[in-house]
Regions:
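Conserved helicase motor core of SF1/SF2 NTP-dependent helicases
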Residues: 226, 230, 234-236, 243-254, ...
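Residue-level recognition of short, solvent-exposed, well-ordered loop/turn junctions
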Residues: 313, 448-453, 489, 537
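Conserved helicase motor core of P-loop NTPases
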Residues: 324-486, 497, 609
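C-terminal accessory regions
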Residues: 482-486, 490-609
């Protein structure tokens, strides 16, 4: 359901709804959010199934929904409660990047959480599998539990990619003399492709599905440029996209070729009737391109990859470009790593650092870190020593405040604590954008949103409306001034341009010139972004990156996280803290194992399409 109005005050809520929800223990904040979403239907929906709230307001938590259910007389052993808990638990696994949960492990955790017998949990899971909500299956000799959508996505991606890799009708031919065309493509840009790059381009041209992976400075962008040039000369149509707007913008800046997000390539829209995001491009209305190139492919999650595969017609080249050593996608699945590990598709692994990039200590040290070696320091890769966390915090603020807000980004492994993103943002906001009589601001819980603040959208919201206003129409895609639409995505960064204290709204301008107005109850969807977690920085680059270095939990203080953080810097990386912990982080090659069956489906080829 779509929201019925821009409700911002408790006085705007129907009295009977306020009374009903307040008696169930809801604060004014949630009463307003619920009424804003479903209006008078709030009473009936909640009486029928109080756990509906978890789908719309996941941050509410299961305990709160459970309290409401108890007040409404829902039995602790009811199917309604247990099935809601299974759904909630699988969402928790997905939030950690897992496509499935091992059944026995899941049932034990759920039984402990609910204080229920595991047999009850298994009975409910069996019922849910019959209704098509979840999928029970065997994988590598054990029973595992999927949301049905993730199971379908794995099977679809495996089957579709296998079919694309060997299209029965063949690929649209490029110019006859491939070697000469590749050489000419390099010369047109004043460069000579290395043997590694030449092989990558050549194999991408003759393969239905190919992967190009490598660290910074290994020439991935040059390969993309060369492929685009060859396709244009051959009269073939090419689409270039990336999972995030910032990554798409970077392609535009480096190649001059039009690029967009994968969502926009697939023409996503919010369906008012179903309440789901729909892709206009699909198997019935496929993309009309001969070649599709996806950059920053390490950020592709399982569900977006399924939508992409559904929209690519047979005979289209699909080229995935990314850095497999970076952190995996925020969403469920480990798509790029699984595709590479399956050995099913041609994969070019770029290892040579090219001359111009070799002069950058950021590039040099990224590769050193990836090999488990200590970084070396200089003008563009700086170590500022400090031991105590408070000293590290003070030095970060001091360093950052001497630079422009637009040029720096603080990246940290954690959200909480002295050096977590929340506390860093409080201090950096004071440094960059202190309160003033000429700056409107709005308090929201413990946060203050002020005109001029840098903020980030922290969850996908397909209902959120935007309008486009840019000085150069069509700069990043086909949208023009005045266009409107819906959908703002997790990780998008913008700046607050206005605050209306009377209407309690905040207006944010995002990087691609979309303006979004947030009502008061929507402000939990954004947070300050002077400092962000490393996971949230994926797909972005910043002129100067500042990284605190102290003790962090071993599961987070990993080589891949440090590598990802360092590779976000374009001109300078500044590490502030204890070099001893940097050494430990570099040595910690522990990688988070994600539950994914995509590799096994490709190897066994028991997917369907």
């Amino acid at each position: 359901m779509d929201k019925i109005n821009n409700i911002t005050k408790i006085s705007q809520v129907a009295p009977e709804v306020t009374w009903f929800l307040r008696n169930l223990g809801f604060s004014n904040y949630y009463i307003i959010k619920i009424y804003d979403l479903v209006g008078d239907a709030a009473i009936g929906l909640t009486e029928d199934n109080p756990y509906w709230l978890l789908e719309e307001f996941p941050r509410m938590g299961f305990d709160k929904a459970d309290q409401v259910a108890r007040k409404l007389g829902v039995s602790p052993e009811s199917h309604l409660r247990l099935s809601a808990a299974v759904t909630y638990g699988l969402r928790a696994y997905a939030a950690e990047g897992h496509a499935f949960a091992p059944l026995e492990e899941f049932c034990e955790k759920a039984a402990g959480f609910l204080d229920a017998d595991t047999s009850l949990i298994k009975d409910v899971i069996e019922d849910m599998s019959f209704s098509g909500d979840v999928q029970l299956t065997n994988l590598e000799g054990r029973q595992v539990l999927y949301f049905y959508g993730y199971y379908r996505a794995e099977c679809t991606v495996a089957g579709k990619l296998a079919a694309l890799a060997e299209p029965p009708g063949g690929l649209a031919p490029v110019a006859a003399n491939i070697d000469a065309v590749i050489k000419k493509a390099g010369q047109s840009r004043g460069i000579e492709l290395s043997p590694q790059q030449t092989a990558a381009v050549k194999n991408s041209l003759v393969s239905g599905v190919s992967i190009v992976t490598g660290g910074p400075g290994t020439g991935k962008t040059t390969i993309i440029d060369s492929i685009i040039s060859i396709m244009e000369e051959s009269g073939l149509k090419t689409a270039v996209a990336a999972p995030t707007g910032r990554a798409a913008k970077r392609i535009m800046e480096t190649s001059g070729y039009p690029a967009c997000t994968v969502h926009r390539l697939l023409e996503y829209f919010y369906d008012e009737e179903t309440g789901y995001m729909i892709f206009g491009k699909n198997s019935e209305n496929p993309l009309d391109y001969d070649t599709v190139i996806i950059d920053e492919a390490s950020m592709l999650d399982l569900m977006l990859t399924e939508a992409l595969c559904n929209a690519i017609k047979p005979g289209t080249r699909l080229i995935l470009v990314g850095d497999a050593d970076q952190l995996p996608s925020v969403g469920a699945g480990s798509v790029l790593a699984d595709l590479i590990d399956s050995d099913y598709f041609f994969t070019a692994r770029l290892t040579e650092i090219h001359r111009q990039s070799a002069e950058s200590l950021i590039v040099t040290n990224a590769h050193r870190i990836n090999r488990g070696e200590s970084p070396v320091y200089g003008e563009d890769f700086v170590l500022v020593k400090a031991d105590k966390q408070q000293d590290i915090l003070d030095k970060i603020v001091d360093i950052a405040s001497k630079l422009s807000m637009e040029s720096i980004q603080v990246l940290t492994p954690v959200k909480k604590g002295t050096l977590g993103s929340a506390n860093l943002n409080d201090r950096l906001q004071q440094a960059f954008n202190p309160a003033g009589e000429d700056k409107a601001q709005l308090e929201f819980g413990s946060r203050v949103f002020r005109v001029g603040d840098r903020v980030m959208q922290i969850r996908n919201d397909y209902r959120l409306e935007y309008r486009v206003q840019r000085s150069t129409p069509g700069q990043f895609d086909s949208r023009t001034d005045g266009d409107t639409g819906k959908g703002v995505f997790n990780g998008e960064i913008g700046v607050i341009k206005s605050v209306d204290t009377e209407m309690r709204t905040v207006t944010v301008l995002y990087d691609d010139q979309r303006w979004v107005e947030y009502s008061y109850v929507q402000l939990d969807e954004i947070e300050p972004a002077y400092a962000i977690t490393v996971h949230k920085s994926q797909g972005s680059e910043f002129p100067t990156v500042i990284i605190p270095m102290t003790w962090f939990p071993p599961a987070l203080a990993t080589r891949s996280l440090l590598y990802t953080a360092v590779t976000r810097g374009k001109k300078q990386v500044i590490i502030v803290g204890n070099p001893g912990y940097l050494e430990k982080m570099t040595a910690n090659n522990q990688s988070r194992s994600l539950n994914s069956g995509l590799k096994e489906r490709l190897v066994g080829m028991y997917g369907f399409y």
